[in-house]
Amino acid sequence: WIFRARHQPMPHIERHAPRHRFHLWSLISTPIILIILLLTTNLNPIYSSIIAMIIGGFAAWYCRPDLKKKMLISGFIFLGFYILYFLFIVLVFPNYVGRVWNLKALSGILIIGIPAEELLFAFSFGFLWSSIYEHFKWRKINHINH
């Protein structure tokens, strides 16, 4: 109901557009980048995850520019839900973040009581995840205009 759209198969001719040469790489880029970062850097895993999901999202965006609007909106929608969830946690358990998160291992920046890294993670997850179905299944969005 948010996007008022239906899915339709992508025509075979479109599947062979130059951008789609990177279709498989786009789909597997996030886990590959995440594994490389986890094994070769001392970054906190949440930073590695954010970097991998953003790069994977942009790889999907390059391959499937028709999903750009959906990806951005989905990133913000998931971020909104995540904020509501965290606000509830912070209101019910005021010291929860300080007790559970190792803020010294993060930036220490809290936005309305939520670690900034959590907000970046939420946006990057929604941004990437929203393109997976259409990309993996070779589906196009057919917008409904009423």
Residue ranges and their predicted role:
Residues 1-146:
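Aromatic-rich, lipid-facing transmembrane alpha helices and their immediate juxtamembrane interface loops
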